A protein has these predicted regions:
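Beta->alpha turn/N-cap motifs
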Residues: 62-63, 251
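Hydrophobic helical h-region of N-terminal Sec-dependent signal peptides
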Residues: 9-13
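Structural scaffold elements adjacent to functional motifs in cytosolic proteins
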Residues: 58-60, 171-173
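N-terminal secretory signal peptides
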Residues: 37-59, 65-66
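Rhodanese-like catalytic fold shared by cysteine-dependent sulfurtransferases
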Residues: 4, 15-42, 68-110, 114-170, ...
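Bacterial N-terminal signal peptides that target proteins for export
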Residues: 1-8
Length: 264
């Protein structure tokens, strides 16, 4: 299966929680609860709080391309970057040191590709060994983040890669209808921000589900939302997540930035 469905994720999460002896409760407050780990986990609710009050540096421990395609908003990446000579790149730990200017007491939260992903665990251990004193993990990772209603962000390099390699992706242009008619991105579909209302199954989102602009037969289709600016795109992306679309990202840039990213 190309995309991880919300049902599969929640079933997996419930099975893992049972395996590790956790009782049922508020799923947003749950953690994987593994034993033998030297770094604490944070729940989805706690991570949302961290991002809201910027009380920790959130690091995506995945390779750069995965980060560029889809990451939790506000997270940064410390993997090797194309074009950086090996003499200038030592390790993820060294990149963390550069990012934090050597301040090893800085609160850090790591995440990667879900419960079975070992990258955040390995990086956490390496950071502890390097003297970092406040390292935690969102071990549920980006699949559960999405399943619990979290939107993600896509970078220009990620947009370029997806456009070239995933022909099932739906681009959603949320600018004004007249702006869309005057020119948009290849195969984009128009859902103007002005028609996206609060609530579920209302306004232009409902109409888009009925008329085929949104892929109602497959809620796991990748949706990339592009607007006049980031705020406009994020608003609509969050509305689509509330409609049970499971793979929604908004573009981190303006419409002109998206055009530039997709320019041949």
């Amino acid at each position: 299966m190309k995309h991880l469905t919300a049902l599969w994720t929640v079933v997996l999460f419930g099975s893992l929680a049972a395996a590790y002896g956790q009782t049922a409760g508020n799923i947003y407050q749950a953690t994987l609860g593994e034993s033998g780990q030297r770094t604490a986990e944070v729940s989805t609710e706690q991570l949302r709080g961290v991002l809201a009050d910027m009380s920790a540096v959130v690091l995506d421990a995945r390779p750069l391309r995965e980060y560029a395609i889809s990451h939790i908003p506000g997270a940064m990446n410390v993997a090797a970057k194309p074009g950086v000579p090996m003499s200038a790149y030592v390790s993820d730990v060294a990149e963390v040191g550069r990012l934090l200017e050597g301040k090893k007491q800085t609160p850090i939260v790591l995440y990667c590709n879900g419960p079975y992903c070992g990258k955040s665990k390995r990086l956490a251990e390496e950071l502890l060994a390097a003297g970092y004193t406040n390292v935690r993990r969102y071990q549920l990772g980006i699949p559960v983040w999405r399943a619990l209603g979290g939107v993600t962000e896509i970078e220009p390099d990620g947009l370029r890669y997806v456009a070239a390699n995933d022909q099932t992706t739906v681009l959603v242009d949320v600018r004004k209808a007249e702006d869309f008619r005057s020119g948009s991105l290849p195969n984009a579909r128009s859902i103007p921000r002005s028609g996206v209302l609060e609530g579920k199954d209302v306004g232009d989102v409902k109409r888009a589900k009925d008329d085929g602009r949104l892929p109602i037969q497959d809620h796991n289709t990748r949706l990339i939302v592009i607007g006049r600016d980031v705020a406009e795109a994020r608003y609509v992306a969050e509305a689509l997540v509330r409609e049970a679309f499971q793979n929604v990202a908004y573009f981190h840039g303006s419409f002109q930035d998206a055009q530039a990213a997709l320019k041949p």
